[in-house]
Amino acid sequence: MIGLTGQDEGGRMQTVDAVVVGAGHHGLVTAALLADAGWDVLVVEERDEVGGAVASRVDGDWVEDEFSACHPLALASPVLRDLGLEHHGLEWAHAPRPLAHLAGRDRDGIALHADPLDTAADLDRGHPGDGAAWLEMVEQWQRVREPLIRALLTRWPPVADAARLVARLGLREAPDLARMALLPVHQLAREHFGGDGAAQLLAGNAMHADIPPTAPGSGLYGWLMTMLCQDVGFPSPRGGTQQLARALRLRAEAAGARVETGVGAGRVVVAGGRVHGVELSDGRRVRVRRAVVADTSAQRLYEDLLDPADVPAGLRRRLARFAWDLPTLKLNLRLDAPVPWTAPQARGAGVLHVGHDVPGLIRWSAELEAGEVPGAPFALVGQMSTIDPSRSPEGTEALWLYTHLPRHRPADAAAVAATVEGCERLLESLAPGWSQHEVGRWVQTPGDLEGADANLVGGAVGGGTQQLFQQALWRPVTGLGGPRTHVGGLYLGSAATHPGGGVHGGCGHLAARAALQDARWWGRPRGRALTGALRWLHDEQP
């Protein structure tokens, strides 16, 4: 492929150090960090608003999050914390009670309280001894929290952070933590607790990912989300999730980055095995001195933005087996009163997991994996006005539920209708008479989610499955477990690459870090070697 040619309207080629394609939260993190280093950075976003899947819509007095809503990992992430977003208007809101789990026609439920002692007391009432086991788990979390989160969000392999983790735990305890990372969540619960309450909290939190509860890795995810919830709650940006994206944009612009919305990338130009620039959707051509970072899906980068001649056959074949996470269906409801939950634990909870106990979750997940529409859904629920009263008029509730459809039926209208009806029946069983308070609704099908954000293919809000076979070295395809591509100076900085889905900024941080390292004179040989290794790998037959 030949390099960029031609001129812009001013009679000259626009040249910058780096172009970031896509202003999702990862792209904005990349832009801020590159601009901090003195780079001239241009961010282009085809939507009219920045944020990608970190977005809200405002309709009168109602503020509704379009995609993600509650972000414990964002609050705990060292990447986002180090950006100082509180200086750019970000404020976190918390519900009185972070979480409750209601299984079936549960009249009581189990709550995760803000104070771990209160959580432990509830668990102990359900099964004596579980309270002490809970506090032991919390104590271990507090010891490993910082090195573990850094290890999960840093480049692969996380040698330095793993060493700090071992030093924190000791050689006797570290192997047990490594084993726990491989456990299915139901086995993790069985080994630590005698009652159902803690098991439901762990398994419900594991369902924030698409890892089946019987699969390796679901234990780690359930434990991580549960301990984060016990540590920082399930917070949401005050005024809507869009406020997080707004703060990231302001932070990037304060560092000197330029952010343009309403204009996307049409083509990434490569010549001689190295990125040269980007042709924009409005006809402009932008040459880059150093890098292009794509905050896009891997498919968008390799199948649309790059010329087919610039994509090795081995990479195309590997990408064809990329697995998306389960399609998401989201039901947004406006109620003129609080939800009439029968379970006291549900009142005042910001997030709820509703519909099944642990055996029920195993059956629900198996139905989805078998390609069937579950007869009885499991849903994640957000009471956003309970978390943040500014989301709706006083005395009302902005409520959402989301659940999943089988992978191969995201556009099936009958499956969507049946699942919406199932969610309505589930809500009626737990909060009789809720529908009498409904004053508005907004259903987001998998197709709607993808239409609003092209990275969410088929309604896959995680940017690809989070199961172990597609993490680290295998995300998005077999490689080196990082943002580098087979093209020099071209980086993938989205949830499609390690460390994967979630609002944490790690993918954008790693892309910026790699670009900065490869641009320094002492880092260039290593960068060229890694790019060459990827080119060799993808030229081989998978």
What kind of feature is each model-predicted range?
Residues 14-151:
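N-terminal glycine-rich phosphate/pyrophosphate-binding loop and immediately adjacent elements
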Residues 68, 493-516:
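A conserved FAD-binding loop/helix module that cradles the flavin
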Residues 127, 338-339, 372-375, 413-454:
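Flavin-binding catalytic cores
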Residues 195-210, 374-380, 433-498:
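A glycine-rich dinucleotide-binding beta-alpha-beta segment and adjacent secondary-structure elements
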Residues 225-279:
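Helical element adjacent to the flavin cofactor pocket in flavoenzyme catalytic cores
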Residues 266-392:
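Mid-domain catalytic core of redox enzymes
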